[in-house]
């Protein structure tokens, strides 16, 4: 690994530009290539394999870091923190999980960047508790306008984020009570036209690509796990689960299944309950 491409070697904007050009030159891995390297690292502790996994994903870290550019924090630092998350993810990645490294690593990358933002962006110091941090990192996704939430929107946001409505109001107030020098230019201040600072938005719209990629990988992984879990059930249990839960257009009633199998509806309910329990256990094993 050259000094130019080493994840921690970021100091100035010029070196960052050079770094980005360098990491974009590393080829992306196919699924088979990635698995081979992951197995070498996981089972044999192969450091060269770890380097291969890291280098091939450095461009993804840059992509994620750009989503946090609105804070005015040095992009080099954001990338550097993201790289720390990537290295932690590579160290913990198990090739038997059945997902691509990018899906696993994105959580670690974002976690490191989030912590960096919370440590260094002065306005974010308003978010100190776990609930407040959760609100801070999700509130902008729920806002449909720049003004205050109405009561209905507060209830919706609170329900979606699993917090109390009062906490939503408190965080909204804290976000509104910004540092004026950071929030407004002198001209805007003189004209009485304060604007909402872009730092209120953790990630810009360009980060959706990473989110979509992550979602697609996890959806495929979940579908595979569900199929394998269903296959572990007996034929009758499979049919009951499919008829009751997997056929959205024609969901079968307990009574219909009872007549089909010549048993009571209560017996079908018991079979369904047992099948769902086994299915949950089986999904957890794969």
Curated annotation (Swiss-Prot):
NCBIfam families from the entry? PRK06596.1, rpoH_proteo, sigma70-ECF
Where is the motif named Interaction with polymerase core subunit RpoC mapped on this chain?
77-80
Subcellular location(s) per record: Cytoplasm
Instruction: Report the sequence similarity comment from the record.
Output: Belongs to the sigma-70 factor family. RpoH subfamily.
Q: Which residues bind DNA?
A: 254-273
**Chain residue ranges for the region called Sigma-70 factor domain-2:** 53-122
Coiled-coil ranges from the UniProt annotation: none
Any one cellular-component term (Gene Ontology): cytoplasm
- What does the UniProt keyword field contain? Cytoplasm, DNA-binding, Sigma factor, Stress response, Transcription, Transcription regulation
> Where do the record's region annotations for Sigma-70 factor domain-4 lie?
229-281
Return the InterPro entries for the record: RNA_pol_sigma-70_dom (IPR014284), RNA_pol_sigma70 (IPR000943), RNA_pol_sigma70_r1_2 (IPR009042), RNA_pol_sigma70_r2 (IPR007627), RNA_pol_sigma70_r4 (IPR007630), RNA_pol_sigma_r2 (IPR013325), RNA_pol_sigma_r3/r4-like (IPR013324), RNA_pol_sigma_RpoH_proteobac (IPR012759)
- Drop me one GO molecular function for this one: sigma factor activity
Q: What is this protein called?
A: RNA polymerase sigma factor RpoH
Q: Does the keyword DNA-binding feature in the UniProt annotation?
A: yes
């Amino acid at each position: 690994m050259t000094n130019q491409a080493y994840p921690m070697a970021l100091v100035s904007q010029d070196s960052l530009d050079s770094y980005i050009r360098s990491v974009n030159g590393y080829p992306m891995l196919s699924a088979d290539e990635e698995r081979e390297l992951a197995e070498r690292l996981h089972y044999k502790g192969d450091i060269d394999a770890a380097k291969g996994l890291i280098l091939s994903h450095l461009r993804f870290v840059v992509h994620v870091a750009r989503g946090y550019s609105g804070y005015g924090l040095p992009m080099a630092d954001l990338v550097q923190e993201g790289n720390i998350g990537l290295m932690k993810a590579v160290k913990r990645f198990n090739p038997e999980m059945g997902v691509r490294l990018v899906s696993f690593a994105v959580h670690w990358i974002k976690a490191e960047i989030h912590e960096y933002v919370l440590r260094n962006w002065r306005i974010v110091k308003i978010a100190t508790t776990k609930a407040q941090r959760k609100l801070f990192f999700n509130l902008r996704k729920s806002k449909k306008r720049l003004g205050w939430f109405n009561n209905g929107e507060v209830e919706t946001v609170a329900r979606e984020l699993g917090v109390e409505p009062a906490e939503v109001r408190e965080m909204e107030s804290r976000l509104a009570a910004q540092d004026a020098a950071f929030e407004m230019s002198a001209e805007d201040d003189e004209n009485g036209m304060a604007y909402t600072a872009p730092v209120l938005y953790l990630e810009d719209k360009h980060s959706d690509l990473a989110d979509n990629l992550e979602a697609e990988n996890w959806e495929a992984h979940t579908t595979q796990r569900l199929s394998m879990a269903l296959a572990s059930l007996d034929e009758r249990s499979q049919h009951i689960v499919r008829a009751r839960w997997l056929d959205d257009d024609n969901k079968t009633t307990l009574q219909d299944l009872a007549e089909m199998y010549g048993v009571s509806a209560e017996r079908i309910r018991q079979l369904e309950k047992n099948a769902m329990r086994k299915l949950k256990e089986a999904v957890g094993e794969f």
